[in-house]
Amino acid sequence: MNSTFDKHIDANDVKKTLSKYILADGFDFVFDMEKSHGSWLVDQRTGKEYLDFFSMFGSMAVGYNHPYILAHAADFAKVGFNKTSISDIYNTYYAEFVDTFGRIGMPSYLPHAFFVDGGALAVENALKVAFDWKVRKNLEKGIGEKGSQIIHYKQAFHGRSGYTLSMTNTSDPRKYMYFPRF
């Protein structure tokens, strides 16, 4: 059986290869996954290091190749390769994470958590909860099913999913022209 990664692509050919299949208009930089460290990004083509003020849109807050992450790579691989539907199927890794998060990261006045796979989904779920709450309150007051508008920053990035894209400032109207506008 052939591996998905049988063909090696040289760092100098990354953008050309990606451009065959996707819109590859990102940075002129090839991320070196082995040599990048802490807050430093390394360009695989040149070896040049760059101080990272980007952190992959905030998803790499602990930096690159953090020693703790590397030391526990096997556990992270198990969790990543065997992703369960955490709302219905549980495992010890999930219980340990939730327990740690609950003890350290949750204030007593917010006793419950809801976990999703990213910022756009978090924003969308927050919007759904807010719409539901507001419409219910308006129905109780007898003013009907009102409550489907929100206030948001115009020049901000909110995500790349349905609701979030309709709030995200983008220069290409084809990306959102048939989405409801908030």
What role is predicted for each listed range?
Residues 1-109:
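N-terminal glycine-rich, Lys/His-bearing helix-loop that initiates the first secondary-structure elements
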